Amino acid sequence: QTIQFQCSPYHTNTALYPAINFLRQAAGLLSQDSVGSQLNKLDAMAIENGIDNKETVSLLADLLSLREDHRYPPLNVSSEKHKDMTLEALIQHMHKLAYRCPVMCIVEDAHWLDPTTLDLITRIIGRIQQVRMLLLIAFRPDFKPVWSDYSHVTSLTLSRLPRRHSAELVTAITRGKVLPPEVQQAILAKADGVPLYIEALTESVLESKVMTEGNDSFTLKGPLKDLPIPDSLHALLMERVDRLGPTKEIVQTGAAIGREFSYDLIRGTVEMPDSQLRHALDLFVASGLIFQEGDIPLATYHFK
């Protein structure tokens, strides 16, 4: 099973923001659900994962701001003790998952971790050798976590792709069809070994209709200067968004929400018929701008 914690630059001071999103998705909670319905779903998830401690479920419910006093009365403890118990409840939940089957936990953009989630991740790493769990944490070089020196932690530095691997990525995107040498050279020179830039730039060139597609290769229709190669990855992505026409508002709204957004949230934000919204999201997924995880209405979308 895969668990994903997606950190956000807009929530660096929101305690346990990635964990809350994970729990909501895992339990299938929707904003239109009543508190009672959401608690029922949380209870069902706890039972499925073998969590029979009511205090643990109560702490998770409190973390999700689900409070029905008759079901889970508030705990009479200090705020610091409550925080400690909440972190332990989350760890217990993850350990129960790992007991059922091996778990891979991915923490994206850890340089945006809020302090409480950083505490949670540090505790998980401290005990990870006891459970069947692989923890993958991606972050920028300037982030210096305390656990980087732990003996059971391996650090990998992801450098720019060498030219040969960059060319292989271009070939994979063109599905084996050969680009004109001058076009491939322009892509590799501009992208400078950045995988996302290589991918987006190659896709942009293929979509621009400046080449004729043959059985095994592409032929440039005009001079190389007509090739659409923006000066930056940001400009390139904005150009691709502009091609979406009127529906680009959906992508722009999703980007304002963060690196990740749910179908439930985008539906409540964008004024558009449900069928039209679903069709637009399908087009965005097909274009490669976003990835979809899960099925609507529980779907979550991630930007590259």
Feature names for model-found ranges:
Residues 19-22, 135, 157, 165-304:
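Short secondary-structure boundary elements
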Residues 120-157:
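Sensor-1/coupling segment of RecA-like P-loop NTPase cores
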Residues 12-104, 132, 148-151, 156, ...:
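Conserved Walker-type P-loop NTP-binding/catalytic site
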Residues 5, 19, 60, 86, ...:
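Conserved RecA-like P-loop NTPase ATPase core
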